[in-house]
Amino acid sequence: MGTASKSYQYNLGTYHRKVTTANAEAQVWFDRGLIWSYAFHHEESARCFEKAIAEDPGCAMSYWGLAFALGPNYNKPWDLFDEKELKKTLETIEHALTEAKDHAPDSTELEQALVDAVQARVPKGLQEHDFKACNEAYAKAMESVYERFSDDLDVTALFADSVMNLSAWDLWDLKTGKPTPGSRSLEVKGFLEKALEQDNVYEHPGILHLYIHLMEMSSTPEVALVAADHLRNLVPDAGHLVHMPSHLDILVGDYRRAIASNADACLADEKYHNEHGGDNFYSFYRMHDYHSLIYAAMFAGQSKVALEAVSRMERSLPASLLSIESPPMADWLENFSSVRVHVLVRFGRWQELLSLPFPNDKDLYCVTIAMIHYGKGVAYAAMGDVEKALRERAALKEAVKRIPSSRICGDFPNKSNVVLKVGEAMLDGEIAYRQGDYDVAFRHLEEAIKRDDALTYAEPWPVRILSDLSHSRDIDH
């Protein structure tokens, strides 16, 4: 093994897929690229595939991997690429696809099939219908590959990924527990569970990762807990994979384990951040892992853990990162600057809320400013100063109007201005409650619940629980 491979400091476990290359270094870099792609760290995945290409320019699968890593994924479909980013990305992908096709004749039959399939993943134009068409074409192409090589775990994972991306974050109807109309969730469940019966499947990060994403929205998320437990320590330095089991831990109420997994994930993320910095899209996943740690700690009543994680997150979220225009980092990340407000509200730290300063840059920190108004409004109401709470309520409504529709909430894929409408109704309920108008208060909280229920599945604050708590306080009163 060469010097470059020996110096690579990330522990990615032992997963290996043999590809057609006589160069041992190229094989090592290919394996790393594939694992990182399963871990949704697409930039590091692409970097590894480029290293593999440098070691063996004739390896078709390394070009395939580069094209795959740079394309759309479950959390970032084509329509969320900004124009500049999309143009540059498509140029790189098209070159990789050409090289993959040129070198495919020297590859195995399965590798040739994968190279052929990924050609369909590039849109013919730059409109939404073009994106939809290429996603469908790629899923159809991968279905053909799966029909020929259904016992191959990588083929199964890639096929599952292609189909799930047709209905990303919309796989199940949360009210009925049934698949959403037009989704192929039961089909994916069937072939992933068939794969889970194979030997060595618990060593495959892609299968385990996708099965968690598939089942977390279902009415039976607990069935994926075994897969989650195998994934927990499988790829120690891939923060997102270390974090993923916590999606299920939260749903089944295992907050202790959710805290532990997210704490480990944050350490892995910080290891990568210390070497490469934060000027990359993986910063979104890094913030999500911090957010999930904070979220679990809030549910567990651990204010110290939550506040320490908030401070770590804030330190790694400088204005310079938010100011990057392509991709538009503020749209993806600025909302995380507002998380401290949620923690202080959760633990009733009213004076700290009232002391929170507003950022100077009202455009860059538009979500944070709105959230601070929300938090101060709750604090004033809780302390009995309804007049000041009403002023904050008015300021909140004006602040929400300033938030562009492109700003994503931490509860991806929801938009911040939509999520804050839940906060508006909650604050209205809190104020009415403090005014002694309980019927009006509960109507506002019920409205907050309706707005919350209308959000796309994510990991949101439980408005129903807050409503129940308010009813309990009324009974006590």
Briefly describe each language-model feature range.
Residues 45, 93, 156, 188, ...:
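Solenoid-repeat scaffolds in large eukaryotic assemblies
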Residues 42-43, 135, 185, 220-221, ...:
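TPR-repeat structural position
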Residues 256-273:
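Flexible glycine/proline-rich, aromatic-decorated loop/lid segments
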Residues 2-58, 63-151, 158-198, 208-218, ...:
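Short coil/linker segments at helix-helix boundaries
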Residues 202:
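Soluble catalytic regions of membrane-associated enzymes that act on cell-envelope
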Residues 205:
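Active-site-adjacent "gating/activation" loops or surface patches in catalytic cores
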Residues 301-328, 334-477:
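Helix-coil-helix junctions within alpha-helical repeat/solenoid scaffolds
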